[in-house]
Amino acid sequence: MNTSQQQQQQQQQQQQQQQQQQQTPQQVENVSAFPPPPPFYKLYLNYKKDVDYSKPTTENSKKNDTPEGNESTIEKNIDNSDEMNIDNNNNNNNNNNNNNNNNNNNNNNNNNNNNNNNNNNNNNNNKATTSTNKKIELNKPLAPPLPPKVGANYVQFGQTYSTVDMLPSLDESGAKQLYPKGDIEPISELKKLNRSILFNYLQLLETLIENPKNYQSKIEDISLLFINFHHLLNSYRPHQARETLLSIMNEQIKQKNQSNESIKKALDICKESLMNSFKNLNIEDKQIDSATPLPTNITSPTKNLMSPTKLNNSQDVNMNENNDDDEDKEINWMDQLLDEMLKIN
């Protein structure tokens, strides 16, 4: 029983110690970046203020009484001082070397950081330029494909086409030609094919009523008729295009003739209105001239005195000459205007 109790007590003590260790914070050693201090600090550890080092102790006095003891102590002190100086110098050199090494390491780290930053910047710039180039390339429209060469074939919507617009014959397409070959009248042949299509359609209705199983042959006949009908229409396309072009040109000629006639009518109306306006202007000028008084010369009344009959005659002559000149000018102006308008037309 005693042994079991002792074991339990020991276990309890161990648990308490573990709990205390967990509760107590772990002591972290102070790690400094500076080098360790020199060993001369050990001199100050044994320093005591109460002790008077000026007075010699009993042991030292006993030793110092003999000349051999004095010499030995002096030599020991000298050796200790030399050793201390050597240690101090070595420590100082080590400290300086450590500082230099630390500075060199710091400079190297700074240079490496700068190089890394420059490399990162260059990489970022390269990425930015590549991204911009990609965006520019995406924004650019796609270049159209090159056109096929003359005589070559190309595929469009799953079908092959030729660059030369040639209508293949029915034999080349694998169908039977029902209308005759050579020079034919396409209109009459189209009418025949249309009638045959209607006749075969009626026969198809009869077969569906009497024998519904035998409808396949009539459907094949109708499909062959439609193929021939479409082929003949396609061969007639150039003639149709020529006729449509002729009709369009005839309509344009009619429209131009109508526009010319309307312009001529407008010119005649303008001529009449201009002539009427000029006539009205001449009448107004004559009325103004008749209302003006006769001129008199005050300086030489004897020389310029004339009979009223002579004055009236001279005024009439002058008026007639002026009117003739005005009419000639009006006629010339009208002729020029008409000539210019005709040139424009």
UniProtKB/Swiss-Prot annotation:
Annotated compartments: Nucleus
Bias (Low complexity): 1-27, 88-126
Claim: Amino-acid biosynthesis is one of the keywords in the record: no
GO biological process: negative regulation of transcription by RNA polymerase II; regulation of transcription by RNA polymerase II
Keywords: Activator, Nucleus, Transcription, Transcription regulation
Chief location of this protein within or outside the cell: nucleus
InterPro entries, alphabetized: Med7/Med21-like, Mediatior_Med7, Mediatior_Med7_sf
Molecular function GO terms recorded: transcription coregulator activity
Entry GO terms, CC: core mediator complex; mediator complex
Region feature (Disordered): 1-130, 292-315
Subunit structure: Component of the Mediator complex.
Entry similarity comment: Belongs to the Mediator complex subunit 7 family.
Job of this protein: Component of the Mediator complex, a coactivator involved in the regulated transcription of nearly all RNA polymerase II-dependent genes. Mediator functions as a bridge to convey information from gene-specific regulatory proteins to the basal RNA polymerase II transcription machinery. Mediator is recruited to promoters by direct interactions with regulatory proteins and serves as a scaffold for the assembly of a functional preinitiation complex with RNA polymerase II and the general transcription factors.
Protein name: Putative mediator of RNA polymerase II transcription subunit 7
Organism this protein belongs to: Dictyostelium discoideum (Social amoeba)
Chain's gene name: med7
